[in-house]
A protein has these predicted regions:
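Canonical Radical SAM [4Fe-4S] cluster-binding loop centered on the CxxxCxxC motif
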Residues: 26, 32-68
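N-terminal "domain-start" segment that seeds a small globular fold
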Residues: 20-26
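Conserved, mostly hydrophobic/aromatic
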Residues: 42, 51, 97, 121, ...
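Non-cysteine beta-strand/loop elements that form the S-adenosyl-L-methionine
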Residues: 139-149
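Conserved Radical SAM active-site core
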Residues: 18-20, 38, 56-138
Length: 150
């Protein structure tokens, strides 16, 4: 197989798997604010709300400053930090809005469960579909951040 054939195959593979990539804005290691215990916090890119008082306004735009990240890369990071989690810690997905990328997160949540890592989702609750239902069924804790009601 020639180099150009390999490049073409890699491009096709990346297009096929684009839905499986996760748009990550940033990480916080040893976080203590976003869920119980010590946590790896993954701030995701993209949100369905445009709150004027947003704590993370740079995560709102779905095409903002983010890195397309393979689920396996996040898994490796979580597993490497697992000794610090203790009995109460784990990983928290925040944002942005995690349910904005529910379909891409489902395989990662399954892998995290296999590793025995506690999963928390910090959500605005504004997206509800079958993917979100499945995502929540895999999570150990959902933190619902109510933005407004009447």
């Amino acid at each position: 197989m020639s180099f150009s054939s390999l490049s073409w195959a890699a491009n096709v593979f990346s297009l096929i798997n684009i839905e499986q990539m996760i748009r990550v804005h940033s990480y916080e290691s040893l976080g203590t604010y976003d869920g119980p215990g010590i946590r790896l916090v993954v701030f995701l890119q993209g949100c369905n709300f445009r709150c004027l008082y947003c704590a993370n306004p740079d995560t709102i735009d779905a095409k903002g400053e983010s890195k397309e990240t393979a689920p396996e890369d996040i898994l490796k990071m979580a597993v490497s930090q697992k000794p610090f989690f203790g009995k109460k810690g784990g990983i928290t997905f925040s944002g942005g809005e995690p349910t904005f990328q529910a379909k891409a997160l489902i395989p990662l949540f399954r892998m995290l469960k296999e590793e025995g890592i506690h999963i928390c989702v910090d959500t605005n609750g504004g997206i509800w579909n079958e993917d979100v239902k499945e995502l929540f069924s895999l999570a150990d804790l959902v933190l619902l951040d109510v933005k407004e009601f009447n």
